[in-house]
């Protein structure tokens, strides 16, 4: 019994010290940031971050590339979790949550992010905060959600307060502009409706760009490429920031049927924690979840499979086939999130529930018998012109 009590006491002590340490570190960070706010804001400095430092990717990446090309006087700072993340140009990399991170947040005129940031980062009057966000929403978002499985008690309040710091919010289409006003609680005046910077490459890419990506992934030139991009499920939370995912693809069956002429790239959502077991299908299925830029995966693929992910909106810009594999459709739309529109009436491509149906649609897609939905394209993709990055920076840097 005494050994058991000793163990319990040890565990309790560990957690108390852990919580205490986190609170102390948080307090130090806040005080340090407040101190750095006494320094002047540099008018030619911009700080970038993609998914809170996890990647060099998405809208911030393409705004950065535009910035170093056409605004060389801007000093660019990139917030990263790992200093090994490769960033071209002369950007200064700073570790997320480091003192340098706090300093540059306090002294950079421009903030360019695609996800929410901690509440401690109060914005000074002369600073400009561009929130690019990271997708056209099918799933209900923020203030529009009836139930948030992953949320804290103050989720909606914090969500709203976070959005009130934004000076500009990027929208890819009229639909998003309307949704963002209700889901974020922002005025239409701050929304820049011009397409997504990350989609510029989808409009402007060349065949050499495609070959470069294929070579980096060791994809044989004559093989067709299937891209699978599922989203995360709100009710499969594993840890504070990670979710599980039960892969519903029969990869052995798909290899047997399509392995001679195609491969499949598996791109899991960044919130999904599971490692994929590809035993037996290593020469057919490839886990590209950590590939830094999903846009590059779009341009090398011939067909995409997704479910409720915003990838469907971006990918349709390529006018390539999209299949929605929605094996849990009723649960997802009615219980977990809810949708902004009826996906059954307006879809980028065929919706399938069962695996045999999926196989049939893949076969059609690979043989050229499946096309994109023009109505879906016209609703969500028509303002993309390949110049969103240029328009946004010209609006922001005046």
Regions found by a protein language model. Give the residues of each.
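Conserved catalytic-core segment of nucleotide-activated headgroup transferases in glycan assembly
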Residues: 57-71, 197-278, 352-354, 388-390
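Active-site and donor-binding regions of nucleotide-sugar-utilizing enzymes
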Residues: 46-205
